[in-house]
């Protein structure tokens, strides 16, 4: 019998490349890339608990490690992370540990956000040049998302975080650590400088994200879904989840075909104007 030792470093490098190239950059108002050495503040619970995958059988994959964004951005990335913001989160997390759920299909879709106040965020904006806001979600087998806060919709805590950080920071980047699209109406409300779906990239996920943030790799991911303004805007919305039959109300106009043909104004992605593609300049 021949024994073969896998060169795990090569697999890790390929995974890192796939993560970086798969990032979907929806908006970039000359915020990214950010050169190493920049002063940055990290907001959001998910920065400390990167979702490497969804739940269910696909989530029960053993990995050797999963590093979180502060470790990678402040370590390999060379960014100067705001110590006061990190310390505030560390103290809060000590009293609000990660909630894992109690069994199969019981893992929460999200983790509650640390409350923020104007004085704290305003002071952080005076110390740091750029804010990274990390919003995380998980879902999976027997645990599909629903049209509720903390799932498809943002929670009140996430809305407050976005409102304050985008108000006081001249440069703000929202990183969506998710496995599926979210409601995106908040982009128009808070106008962050950059928005990116970083997805769930396994154990090398945060390293791949770093390669996009610092300009080593140009994000070339494409959305697998059309993002409507509201769930009710999808043509199949009124016929979803029937117990006795499947009724394909959209006929041949599935996905983008419906919006492109009949309702471009109901679309949040570049069929409309919420994410102007002229601002997606990226130099590596």
What residue spans do the PLM features occupy?
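C-terminal non-catalytic regions of proteins with extracellular/luminal or membrane-system context
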Residues: 1-284
């Amino acid at each position: 019998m021949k024994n073969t030792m896998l060169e795990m470093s090569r697999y890790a490098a390929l995974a890192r490349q796939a993560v970086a190239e798969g990032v979907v950059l929806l908006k970039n108002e000359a915020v990214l890339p950010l050169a190493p050495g920049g002063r940055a503040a990290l907001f959001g619970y998910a920065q400390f608990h990167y979702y490497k995958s969804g739940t269910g059988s696909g989530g029960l994959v053993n990995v050797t490690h999963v590093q979180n964004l502060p470790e990678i951005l402040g370590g390999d990335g060379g960014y100067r992370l705001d110590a006061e913001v990190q310390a505030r989160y560390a103290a809060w997390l000590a009293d609000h540990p990660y909630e894992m759920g109690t069994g199969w299909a019981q893992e929460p879709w999200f983790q509650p956000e640390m409350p923020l106040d104007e004085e704290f965020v305003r002071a952080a904006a005076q110390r740091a040049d750029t804010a990274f806001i990390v919003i995380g979600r998980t879902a999976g087998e027997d645990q599909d998302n629903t049209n509720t806060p903390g799932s498809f919709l943002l929670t009140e805590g996430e809305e407050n975080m976005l409102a304050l950080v985008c108000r006081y920071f001249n440069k703000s980047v929202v990183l969506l650590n998710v496995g599926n699209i979210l409601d995106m109406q908040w982009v128009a409300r808070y106008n962050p400088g950059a928005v990116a779906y970083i997805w769930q990239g396994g154990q090398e996920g945060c390293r791949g994200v770093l390669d996009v943030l610092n300009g080593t790799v140009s994000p070339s991911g494409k959305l697998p879904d059309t993002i409507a303004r509201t769930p009710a805007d999808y043509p199949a919305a009124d016929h979803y989840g029937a117990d006795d039959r499947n009724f394909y109300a959209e006929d041949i106009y599935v996905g983008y075909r419906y919006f492109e043909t009949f309702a471009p104004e109901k679309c949040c992605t570049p069929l409309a104007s919420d994410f102007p593609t002229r601002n997606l300049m990226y130099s590596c």
